[in-house]
Amino acid sequence: MAGGLALSGATVRVLDPSGKAIATGKAVSATTGTYGPITLTGTGTFRVEACGTVADKPLCVWGLTNTGGTLHLTPMTSAIAVLASGLGPEALMNGALAAIPDATLANVHTQLRTALAPALADAGLAAGFDLLAGALTPGAHTGYDRLLDTVGVSLGTDTKAFVSLTSRLGSGTAYLEPGTTQGSLSVDAAAASVDLPALDALFAKLIGATASNAACVNSQTGLASLMDPNARASIDPATSAFTGATQAAQIICLRLNGVLGEGEVMFGGKLLPTTLGRCALGAGDPLCRVDFVYQNSKGFQRRLGVEQAAVKRGSGWVLLGNRLEVQATAVSRVVLTRRVDATAADSTARYLDISIPALTVSGGAVLQCARVSQLDASGNSLPLAFFKNAGSGSYLSLWSASSSDATPSLDPATGALRGADQVALPLASGAAGDAVARNFARAGRALQIDLYSDSACATPLSGLDGASISIDLAGLPPIAAASQSGQPWPALATAANSALAALKVAANAKLTYNPTWTTTRAGLAFNRAQLCPDKACSTRLAETELAAGATTAALSATLGSTALADNAYKLLRLTGRTLDGLVLQLDAQSCSALPAGSPC
């Protein structure tokens, strides 16, 4: 059982053909990834699910079997399960499942292997390798495990269930629906130079070098000794980087020791193992995007820098730090808005949160404008939005149709800014938004960001990155409405809903609210809970950080001079992220002054 590394803290659940759970909570070995044995009784197609974490990410994987025996659970077996059943992840483990003939499973297996052919060859595997039961050693980074390391697998539902495959060591996207494949992935000729066991060894050294302040600053074995001479590190994405191994290491060590950043001392925790990101090969030394995530002593995760990279020099892998001078990020987010004090229809909305620092780059030019575009399945570049410098704030703001309309304006000469740090790009709720999401599934998640030094978006920026950069979107936006509502959303307990509706606090009095919830399915790592008196959550009455597996939050604060009435608008916002970085945001609202049936 693996996703390139053995799942940590994982358990297995098995459903019989009727949808009845015949095994739950069966532990998975954290060292070998093995599970079972589990006895199957009856005939038909059994569904097997394992959920846990890989490095800093939550992961659920699935498999189908008619006969039992050895069954791996990996992203590849998940792809087979989705294509053979015709069900997306939101529906796969719900209800009864009609028997799937062995011939159908075999045909889907062949379809997937055909799409994976270049990656199978790179991993040294035969074209007919058994993805369901072939030899697999989690964490070995060779053979089947290398395949899991180097191929990105996304699952979802459009008009049909689909699988999207991308190569981290090459280019292209293979898009599969039951019985059909569009596009293809390729592996770079220099892919063999990406020595993953050696990259793993670098991170083992980095884990040791960041274990304590003394280890971090050690002149012989400390962080600087593991960084490239051209390494870059920043206090935050909106500030210029410090360059060189010594200065970059100092910045990171000071951040970990609480001297820089938000003042939190992180030593006493640990750096988490990385999972491989997209690699740049062919021209120059191999460079791969990596995660640099530190888990503090309380179990909370801190991402140190964005778009971090490691580079393989003649002497081996070293940490490069910031891949880009302009450390832009893009994250897909889905918001579920639910009224909890009375009956009303739920609503969902999709966003791309594109954060582009309003930075002064090398040479002194200031970033004033950026044009963001994606590719469609035919390779055409499609503009999504412009972002401009608002004159304040840390990030460029969306160039909108008007000051009261967040619809993006695609004309840099016509439009308006709606304030500082307006990074959210809304996707339309209908076909237009679906088309944008569909392009990410069929043509890959790369976003091109063209950079300009003038507000007219006409003069290319001169900096270390050149006039444009490419970043990957974290999280695949769900396409079908059922896929949006079928994400692993938290469901507040009835008592939590009632308590939010009844919550009232006198001026200058203490507020206490302790909501609890369950999740509709596994695969969401929580990170924050907020209690707010406005829909934008611009004012926060209370907030708290959450552990990934949280099922409750303790919110408390002392109110100011304005009382909170029981019939006032109140918002509980819970946020978390899925395996591929998709952010899920539940906005649970109470507005008892409005009639039932109306949205807040």
Language model features with spans:
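Feature for extracytoplasmic/surface-facing segments of secreted or surface-associated proteins
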Residues: 1-306, 313-326, 330-335, 526, ...
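Extracellular Ig-like/FN3 beta-sandwich strand-entry sites
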Residues: 43-45, 442-446, 565-571
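Short beta-strand elements
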Residues: 68, 327-328, 461-487, 580-600
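Signal that preferentially marks extracellular ectodomain short beta-strand elements
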Residues: 276-279, 405-442, 551-566
